[in-house]
Amino acid sequence: MLIACRTTILRTALVVGLLLTAWPGHAFDIQKVTSPSGITAWLIEDHSNPVIAMEMIFDAGAANDPTDKEGLANLLASTLDEGAGELSSTDFQSALSEKSISLYFRAGTDRFRGIVSTLTANSDTAFEMLRLALHQPRFEAAAVDRIRAQIMAKIRSDTQQPQSRAWRLWLQELFPSHPYGRPRDGTLESVARIDSDDLRRFAKAGLSRQGLSIGVVGDISAERLARVLDQVFADLPAQSSLPPVADQQPISDGQIRVIDQDIPQSVIVFGHAGIAWGDPDYFGAALLMQIVSGGFQSRLVQEVRVKRGLAYGISASLFPRDHSAMVIGSTATRNAKARETVEIIRAQWRKMAEQGPTASEITDAKSYLIGAFPLRFTDSPAIARSLAGFQHLGLGPDYPNQRAAMINRFTADDLKRIARRLFQEENLTFTILGRPQDIPTGSRAKSATQ
């Protein structure tokens, strides 16, 4: 109960700290802090509440997993905080709990994130424990086996979830020989092969200062943060030694692949190549995706759900990964209506490419993308996450204050041009899991009517 109470106090303080730091209509005052050894972080300094949140991003992720050890980055993220230095797994977790410190790691496809949140009074301990986790992880066999078992249980569960399976199969189809086509958590076989030495090698190779991005929010001065940066990160390797990941265009050939599964609904995943982050057209593409599938008033939701009742929900988004930009969407409908749903998606893709958006759609989409932006900053860790993410994308500290202008600059003619570029109906590639009527199992037809 004491631990739960302390955790509640920390969470409340983090949220209150946010409300006094940033809110819609107010500018972000971001400081760029550089340590004596040259490590850089972005800081929003706020002494109104005694809390600090830090997020760090390393240039490493599941895409860097060895071909026979898929799931390595994920297992590493799940075991880095399971004991470090002289502290066993139990002792390490107990120390975190006693000081109300939140410390954990997450492995994405291209990113490896670390997150720490702490009360100011316990921040010396928090940063030292972060340092230990990064530099002296124990990877005790018992702890690794326990976390491995949890991950394998999740893998088994995911294989029984039609939505997860359909997404995985779609990615395999578009990236048959690329890391993006592999499951991020790995397979039962690959996770079973990973040992503590594999974890140590990946940590040493991938957790480096190269590409390191750090965001910090809260009750800490720039001077103290500079010292903390060197304390925690200065002794990491200067360069990553992970093998590079190749850029790859998705093989989106406009075909439909049907995988038989005896379920009442057909789960549909669709998409093709997209527009990369950093492309001058990116925010224009984001506006168009908002119009097509961004909410209840979007074209796909209106056509698929509201007018025809074919599905409860349908969505599509830009997925600008580091080495391949994609558009990915999904829905689920009755097997008898899968063909109709596919044709509606194709028709909406074709309509946007040929006609572009209307003036009212553009106005509404701009209003939403600009107005919703501050809502992502739900607490201090969320702000720290955004600061690290913006930095990692190569944006400047003024990005939060310039973003609205970056969106508003797109004209109707710009968006019509981008629509012709983005919405490639002929390349729209589908994976359908289920028993859709009028689309044969194993079908690779160019159209659902064939």
Locations of regions flagged by a protein language model:
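N- or domain-start disorder-to-order transition segments that initiate the globular core
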Residues: 26-50
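M16/MPP (pitrilysin/insulinase) zinc-metallopeptidase core fold and M16-derived inactive scaffolds
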Residues: 30, 55-120, 183, 295-310
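N-terminal signal peptide c-region/cleavage motif recognized by signal peptidases
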Residues: 22-24
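Small-molecule pocket liners
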Residues: 52-56, 212, 265-268, 327, ...
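Charge-rich, well-structured scaffold segments of protease-associated domains
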Residues: 34, 91-241, 258, 276, ...
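Bacterial N-terminal signal peptides that target proteins for export
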Residues: 2-13
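His/Glu-based metal-binding/catalytic segments typifying zinc-dependent metallopeptidases
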Residues: 46, 55-57, 241-297
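Short, solvent-exposed loop/turn elements at domain surfaces
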Residues: 42-43, 50-53, 63-66, 440
